């Protein structure tokens, strides 16, 4: 990527608010300086391979209903809001990360996403990782290893580079350090009372998915953990001692941090554990940087992530129960985005597992609009009152 390559802004740039304009200028300047930028949309994306290509990786999952009307010009209305929002931001050119990315890495998780990627590819080069539907058969693991190899090859060909094993090992060490910092921050919520607002925790983790500099973000997290720990040890208690301790599980929470997370915390609860695909159960999975076949170690780490698209998926329920014990959970709230069939169907098994352990459970099926806010607040308040 040559330096000082002119990066044009969208034709609608002047219509954006100042915050969005500033975001576009920031990413434009980053790209114009010759930097590489790759968008991704799923926790199964092997980020170490992108890192090893010298590219910054940014999450592109849509979390707002702002652009859904634009998306529905192409996509069906009765589709998951995350899918519609993601496509809508690309279609309307309102997301600077999508607009300026060199390419997007998609994956065959749910049916809606994998078909949306065909349309997204018409707007922006999109490479698809073919994720197997399970991982307990040898050919599935071998197939995924090949997908990771093909991603490495795609990035090498696109950028005209060679990604070495040493490059991958450096990337693994950086990501391991980041995940260790995330785990330390998650662990602060095991304190009784919790050391911070769960909304603050979720917002901090969500913001990290837009960072161009892994090491800088890792240092920020490490410093924040130290400050929070020191404040807690000094007697600061930002969370009430009688706040009911809630674990959130289910679909990605980025689009419902305020809708569900803040509602929990304004009704006598505190979110002590994020048990979605960007939470502790995924961050806890490290990679051995000294593994003889480092690419295979990377591939294996990602395939072992628990998600409702996998069959079987017993590990997710087992992990949730372990998190309930670790974080002294009073109740579990499962967030299911409308039309997310895999999480919606699997919620029956989650409810059975959680209630079988003697922990109250509630499922909330919602989208990114505010139309059901009153109903959700009533249900959450009633649920917390029973704990």
What do these predicted ranges mean?
Residues 101, 324, 328-333:
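Proline-aspartate-enriched helix->loop->beta-strand connector
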Residues 2-3, 348-387:
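Peripheral docking tails and interdomain loops at the edges
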Residues 90, 311-328, 345-346:
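A short, acidic, amphipathic alpha-helical segment used as a generic capping/interface helix at domain edges
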């Amino acid at each position: 990527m040559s330096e000082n390559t002119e990066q044009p802004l969208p034709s609608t740039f002047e219509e954006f608010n100042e915050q969005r304009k500033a975001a576009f200028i920031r990413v434009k300047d980053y790209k114009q300086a010759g930097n590489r930028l790759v968008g991704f949309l799923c926790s199964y994306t092997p980020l170490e391979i992108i890192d090893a290509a010298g590219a910054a990786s940014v999450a592109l999952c849509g979390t707002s209903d702002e652009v859904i009307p634009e998306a529905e010009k192409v996509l069906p209305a009765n589709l998951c809001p995350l899918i519609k929002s993601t496509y809508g931001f690309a279609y309307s050119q309102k997301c600077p990360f999508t607009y300026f990315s060199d390419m997007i890495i998609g994956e065959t998780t749910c049916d809606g996403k994998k078909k949306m990627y065909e349309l997204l590819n018409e707007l922006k080069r999109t490479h698809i990782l073919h994720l197997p539907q399970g991982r307990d058969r040898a050919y599935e693991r071998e197939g995924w290893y090949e997908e990771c190899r093909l991603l490495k090859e795609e990035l090498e060909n696109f950028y005209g580079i060679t990604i070495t094993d040493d490059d991958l090992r450096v990337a693994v060490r950086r990501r391991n350090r980041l995940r260790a910092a995330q785990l330390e921050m998650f662990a602060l919520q095991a304190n009784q009372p919790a050391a911070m607002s769960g909304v603050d925790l979720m917002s901090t983790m969500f913001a990290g998915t837009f960072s161009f500099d892994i090491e800088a973000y890792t240092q920020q997290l490490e410093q924040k953990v130290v400050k929070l720990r020191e404040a807690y040890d000094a007697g600061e208690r930002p969370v009430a001692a009688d706040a009911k301790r809630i674990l959130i599980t289910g679909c990605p929470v980025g689009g419902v941090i305020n809708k569900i997370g803040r509602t929990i915390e304004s009704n006598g609860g505190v979110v002590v554990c994020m048990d979605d695909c960007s939470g502790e159960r995924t961050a806890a999975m490290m990679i051995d940087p000294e593994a003889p076949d480092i690419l295979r170690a990377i591939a294996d780490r990602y395939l072992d992530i628990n998600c409702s698209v996998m069959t079987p998926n017993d590990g997710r329920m087992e992990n949730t129960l372990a998190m309930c014990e670790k974080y002294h959970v009073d109740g579990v709230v499962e967030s299911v985005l409308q039309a997310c069939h895999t999480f919606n169907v699997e919620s029956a098994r989650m409810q059975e597992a959680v209630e079988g352990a003697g922990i109250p459970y509630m499922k909330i099926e919602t989208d990114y609009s505010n139309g059901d806010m009153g109903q959700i607040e009533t249900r959450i308040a009633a649920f917390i009152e029973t704990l």
